[in-house]
Amino acid sequence: VRESHNSRSMRGIASIVRESRPAAGPIAAAQLDAGADAAKDAMWGGAARLSASGATTMSDIVTESAACPAHALEVPKLEALPKGAAPQLTCYQLGPHAAPIIPGRRDRAWMDATSEHYAYRCLPLSMANTSGWEITSPLDFEVTWNGNQDINAITARAPGVDPNVLRALITSHFAHGILTFHTGWLFRTSPGWGLWVRGAPNDAKDGIHALDGMVETDWLPFPFTMNWRFTRPCTVRFRKGDPFCFITLCPHALLDGVAPRRASIEDDPKLKADYVEWGKSRAEFNKLLRDGDPAAVAKKWQRDYFQGKAGGGDAPFHVNKRRLKPIE
C-alpha cells in the first residue's frame, strides 16, 4: 500500500480483509510483506474497471468519467449538487482477482439462534446489516498470531493456494498483531462523500476485531487497506464468502457543520405527547404478555416502528428493507 500523510492517517480506519492459503505450510508475515508488491503487480495488473450506471437511488453504483484523473478533482460544496441526485460510487477493479462485492446480507448466525429469531424484530439491526456492500473472501484461509509485536508474529495458511496469491492478499505491515488485507479495488465517490470502512455490522469474530476507517474516496488516487487487530494470541479462520470488509457511503463533508442542540422535551409538546403515549402503550402491552393475555401472546410484539407508525400516523419516510443494487 502506498504510504503518504493521508494514507497514514487512514490506517486506523482500516476495515477489510483478504484471504488465501499457502501451498506448503505457514508463511511468515514478514515473507508475506516482502513479496506482496511483486505479487500484486502480477495478480492485479493494469487498470481493469467495473462499474454500473443508471443511478436512481443512493445505492446505485455509477460510472465516473475516466478522463477526470483523481488528482485533478475539485470538491465543490454539497449544495452545488443537483437536488435529489444520488451520490456516485465507482468501483475500479485493479485486476482479475479482486474480492467479490455484494449488497449487505441481513442474516446473522447469532440472530438466527435467538428464540423464534426474535433478534430480527429489531429493525435497526437488520437495517445496519444491509446498509452497505460486503467485500467477501474468495476462499478459505486461517491466520495465527503468537502474541509478539513484530511483523514476524503472524503466520498464514491457505492449503492449495499459490504463495504469491497469499502474499498479494495479506501482510503484517503494521506489526502489533494487526493483519492487513488488500481488496483489489480503488473506490471513487461523489464530492463530499466518503466511505465508512469496517467489518460487517453485528458480526463478531472471536479473537480478532475489524478496525473502522473513514476514507475520503472523493479524491483519493490509490486504494486503502483493510486491517484487523488480534485481541489475543490465537488462530482465526475466514471461510469463502465471509465478509471481511463492509463499505457504506457517508456525507463526511457535512459532519463538521452539525451543531448538536440541547433541548427540553417540554419544548415540543407534540413530541412529548407521542413519547408519553408510546411509553404507556409499551408498558401495557408488556404487562399483557407477562399475564399471558391470548391476544398479546398471539401478536408477540408491537410493530409500530417496523411499520413506520408513530403518534397515530405514518412516518413521512420509512424503510424496513434495503434493496441495494449489486455491481453489474
Show the residue positions of the predicted features.
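Residue-level detector of intrinsically disordered terminal segments
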Residues: 9, 42, 56-57
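Short alpha-helix capping/helix-loop boundary micro-motifs
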Residues: 228-232
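Aromatic sugar-binding surface patches on proteins
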Residues: 220-226
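Residues marking helix boundaries in flexible regions
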Residues: 14-17, 28, 44, 62
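Non-catalytic terminal segments and appended small domains
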Residues: 54, 58-220, 234-328
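Low-acidity, Ser/Thr- and Arg-rich intrinsically disordered low-complexity segments
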Residues: 2-11, 15-21
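Ser/Thr/Pro/Gly-rich low-complexity, intrinsically disordered segments
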Residues: 6, 19, 29, 39-40, ...
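Residue-identity detector for glycine
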Residues: 12, 25, 35, 45-46, ...
